[in-house]
Curated annotation (Swiss-Prot):
GO terms for biological process: phospholipid transport. InterPro entries: ABC_MlaE_roteobac (IPR003453), Permease_MalE (IPR030802). Its main location: membrane. The chain crosses the membrane at residues 12-32, 52-72, 97-117, 140-162, 167-186, 192-212, 234-254. It comes from Synechocystis sp. (strain ATCC 27184 / PCC 6803 / Kazusa). This is Probable ABC transporter permease protein slr1045. Pfam families: MlaE. Keywords: Cell membrane, Membrane, Transmembrane, Transmembrane helix, Transport. Signal peptide: none annotated.
Length: 263
């Protein structure tokens, strides 16, 4: 019985994954056709952005401080004090800021998307939208995809700044590193391409989170229990997709070597 349930869950997961790919194509087609509900889009942008800002920035600040604590002592021991800021900057810009911000948004916003749309599905509210000649993709999905795609890069940029500020505070207060040395290292290591890649990653992650959350919500069945299962699997799938896509994006964007100024 357990094996049968596991096979059913895996089959349902793959079906939802295929549905998510088809939904992605539909969403972009609707956007190109200008079928955008502006009011809903603004509401979702407020949810993804301002309402999620505090937890994202707190996470980034402590990550920057912890990272600095972990590397500063070792770098000072080997006489590499002038590289601490640059290493933190590259780590945050290329990986930590976009990935951790996406993880926070997947947990907070992606789960909300799946739960809200899933509840509408099992209570037949989506059928009511069809009866009112309203396409659920236009009304529910497109605004959420646009909101995540626009707001996640902004949140990531703010998280990057806060994470760097946290690292600067720790390096100067605990390890007596001159802030000028720290900031010069950041400037020498970080290139404009790194910032662009950071924001582009966030855009991709935002679309992934919204598509998976909405797709899992639209395919929810089984009442309240089904909503709970959809919400849980939507978050887990979003995290898995974020990590996998991050690998390929990093491989494509940063596979070159020797592209960082060490002077």
């Amino acid at each position: 019985m357990s094996d049968r349930g596991s096979r059913h869950s895996l089959s349902l997961w793959f079906q939802r994954l295929v549905a998510a790919f088809f939904l992605t194509g539909q969403v972009f087609l609707h956007i190109l056709q200008g079928r955008i509900n502006r009011r809903n889009t603004l509401e979702q942008m407020n949810m993804v952005g301002p309402e999620s800002m505090a937890i994202a920035l707190i996470t980034a600040g402590f990550v920057g401080m912890v990272f600095t604590i972990q590397v500063a002592r070792e770098f000072i021991y080997y006489g590499a004090t002038t590289t601490i800021g640059g290493v933190l900057s590259l780590s945050l810009t290329r990986e930590l800021a976009p990935v951790l911000t996406a993880v926070v948004i997947a947990g907070r916003v992606g789960s909300a998307f799946a739960a809200e749309i899933g509840t509408m599905r099992v209570t037949e509210q989506l059928d009511a939208l069809y009866m009112l000649r309203t396409d659920p993709i236009d009304y529910l999905v497109v605004p959420r995809v646009i909101a995540c795609g626009l707001m996640l890069p902004i949140l990531t940029g703010l998280s990057l700044f806060v994470g760097m500020a946290g690292g600067l505070v720790i390096s100067s207060s605990l390890y007596a590193i001159n802030p000028t040395i720290f900031l010069n290292s950041v400037q020498n290591f970080t290139q404009l391409w790194d910032v662009f890649a950071c924001l582009f990653k966030s855009l991709v992650f935002g679309v992934i989170i919204a598509i998976i959350g909405c797709s899992w919500g639209l395919t929810t069945t089984g009442g309240a229990k089904g909503v709970g299962e959809s919400t849980t699997t939507a978050v887990v799938t979003s995290l898995l997709a974020i990590f996998i896509s991050n690998f390929f994006l990093s491989w494509l964007m940063f596979q070159g070597t020797g592209d960082t100024a060490l002077g």
